[in-house]
């Protein structure tokens, strides 16, 4: 009994496989009518034909005859010429359709169809799009949304017309697919995150496209977006340049302060004096004409960007040179400049003095060692001279006594 059941199951599987393999693929848009022709059937009654279908509406093969009638007529019915008519195909109509007909000469003809349905969604859109991105850190570009597709299809992102590959060069994509419980249509969402490179394109172009799950259907593309890319500027890159150098001028002179910020787009520049903001419009240049005592103090510039915190430069000191006085050597930025140079020269001078003292001490030690070595040599010479003198004195005495 079990063997017979297994054989029957295999026969059913093989019959279904044969139907699918030899079937003609038919694609129909959801909601539109579909007509399947029964090959070999007489165009007029009497007809000997039979339609069998296995779809989402049936648990097994459903048989339809030309006589028709019943609730199935609203779903599918046999036309007088033997064709099968579906007034409005839906997702449940996907499956296998087979027609077996015999002509008036008794020749049997079979027709096999594999029906697939589809629904093209509306044009996808990018929602929650960013107007500005920050270089060097992950940013959300936006979310691409496609609603009402069947099959689900896929969403893809593009940068300047070229496909973006997730998990490469700071690109990540978070996808979500939902299916409507009643219509069976799909809604796709794709969230794009990128890390723009420093020094890259300041206005990249992003777009998203929907590709249907069926061949021979063109992709649908969103309208492009062009967010700006802003590069955060480290504090040390906000430079304050003062003219004349040093910031010391005679009364009535002019001082020009320039705040240099190598960032795109350029941030707003505000000015501060002695830690208090100056009531001036944003400008990268501050000119102080006809310097007076009231203009003396410490100045700095603050670079402010819409999506970033303010960044302040180091301070520069502005002072007045009175007649007969020399300007301060340290009208420099944050105690640097000439003050730093003087400190470096002082350190080098100290090191040179120490080296000179060490050289003198070593020279004196060498002189002392040389004198200590010469002292014993002089003592030996004196002893030799004394011995010679003693030997010469007896000889002189003998020569004197032995005279005539």
From Swiss-Prot:
It is a single-pass type I membrane protein. Residues 23-342 are extracellular. It is found in: Cell membrane; Cell projection, Phagocytic cup; Early endosome; Nucleus. Residues 124-221, 227-317 form the Ig-like C2-type domain. Disulfide bonds join 38-99, 144-208. Residues 23-116 form the Ig-like V-type domain. Its main location: membrane. The modification Phosphoserine is found at residue 391. Induction: Induced in T cells by antigen stimulation and by the S100B ligand. Induced in trophoblasts by DNA damage. Keywords: Cell membrane, Cell projection, Disulfide bond, DNA damage, DNA repair, DNA replication, DNA-binding, Endosome, Glycoprotein, Immunoglobulin domain, Inflammatory response, Membrane, Nucleus, Phagocytosis, Phosphoprotein, Receptor, Repeat, RNA-binding, Secreted, Signal, Transmembrane, Transmembrane helix, Ubl conjugation. Residues 1-22 form the signal peptide. Phosphorylated on its cytoplasmic domain by PKCzeta/PRKCZ upon ligand binding. Phosphorylated by ATM following DNA damage. One of its GO terms (cellular component) is plasma membrane. GO terms for molecular function: advanced glycation end-product receptor activity; amyloid-beta binding; DNA binding; histone binding; identical protein binding; laminin receptor activity; molecular adaptor activity; protein-containing complex binding. Residues 378-396 have a biased composition (Acidic residues). The chain crosses the membrane at residues 343-363. Endothelial cells. Increased expression in pre-term labor and preeclampsia placentas compared to controls. Constitutive homodimer; disulfide-linked. Forms homooligomers. Interacts with S100A1 and APP. Interacts with S100B, S100A12 and S100A14. Interacts with TIRAP. Interacts with HMGB1. Interacts with LGP2; this interaction plays an important role in AGER-mediated pro-inflammatory responses and cytokine release. Interacts with double-strand break repair protein MRE11 which is a core component of the MRN complex. The interaction enhances MRE11 endonuclease activity and promotes DNA repair. Cell surface pattern recognition receptor that senses endogenous stress signals with a broad ligand repertoire including advanced glycation end products, S100 proteins, high-mobility group box 1 protein/HMGB1, amyloid beta/APP oligomers, nucleic acids, histones, phospholipids and glycosaminoglycans. Advanced glycosylation end products are nonenzymatically glycosylated proteins which accumulate in vascular tissue in aging and at an accelerated rate in diabetes. This is Advanced glycosylation end product-specific receptor. It comes from Homo sapiens (Human). The lineage of its organism: Eukaryota, Metazoa, Chordata, Craniata, Vertebrata. The gene is AGER.
């Amino acid at each position: 009994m079990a063997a017979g059941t297994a054989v029957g199951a295999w026969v059913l599987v093989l019959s279904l496989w044969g139907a699918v393999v030899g079937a003609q693929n038919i694609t129909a848009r959801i909601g539109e009518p579909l007509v399947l022709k029964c090959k070999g059937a007489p165009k007029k009654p009497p007809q000997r034909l039979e339609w069998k279908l296995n779809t989402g509406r049936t648990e097994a093969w459903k048989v339809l005859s030309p006589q028709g009638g019943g609730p199935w007529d609203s779903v599918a019915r046999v036309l007088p010429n033997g064709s099968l008519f579906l007034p409005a195909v839906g997702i449940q109509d996907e499956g296998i359709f087979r027609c077996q007909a015999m002509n008036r000469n008794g020749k049997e003809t079979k027709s096999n169809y594999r029906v697939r349905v589809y629904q093209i969604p509306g044009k996808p859109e990018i929602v929650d799009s960013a107007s500005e991105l920050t270089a060097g850190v992950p940013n959300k570009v936006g979310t691409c949304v496609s609603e009402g597709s069947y099959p689900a299809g896929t969403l893809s992102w593009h940068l300047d017309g070229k496909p973006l590959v997730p998990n490469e060069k700071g690109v990540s994509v978070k996808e979500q697919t939902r299916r409507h419980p009643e219509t069976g249509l799909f809604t796709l969402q794709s969230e794009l995150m990128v890390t723009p490179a420093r020094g890259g394109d300041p206005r990249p172009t992003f777009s998203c496209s929907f590709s249907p799950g069926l061949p021979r259907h063109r992709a649908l593309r969103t309208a492009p977006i062009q967010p700006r890319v802003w590069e955060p500027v480290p504090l040390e890159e906000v430079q304050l340049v003062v003219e004349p150098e040093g910031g010391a001028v005679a009364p009535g002179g002019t001082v020009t302060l320039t705040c240099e910020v190598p960032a795109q787009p350029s941030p707003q520049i505000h000015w501060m004096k002695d830690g208090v903001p100056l009531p001036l419009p944003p400008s990268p240049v501050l000119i102080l004409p006809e310097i007076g005592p009231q203009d003396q103090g410490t100045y700095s510039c603050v670079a402010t960007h819409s999506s970033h915190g303010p960044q302040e430069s180091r301070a520069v000191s502005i002072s007045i040179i009175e007649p007969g006085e020399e300007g301060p050597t340290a009208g420099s930025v944050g105690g640097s400049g000439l003050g730093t140079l003087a400190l470096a020269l002082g350190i080098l001078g100290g090191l040179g003095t120490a080296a000179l003292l060490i050289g003198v001490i070593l020279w004196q030690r060498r002189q002392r060692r040389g004198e200590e070595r010469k002292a014993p040599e002089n003592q030996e010479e004196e002893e030799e001279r004394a011995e010679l003198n003693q030997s010469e004195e007896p000889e002189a005495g003998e020569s004197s006594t032995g005279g005539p």
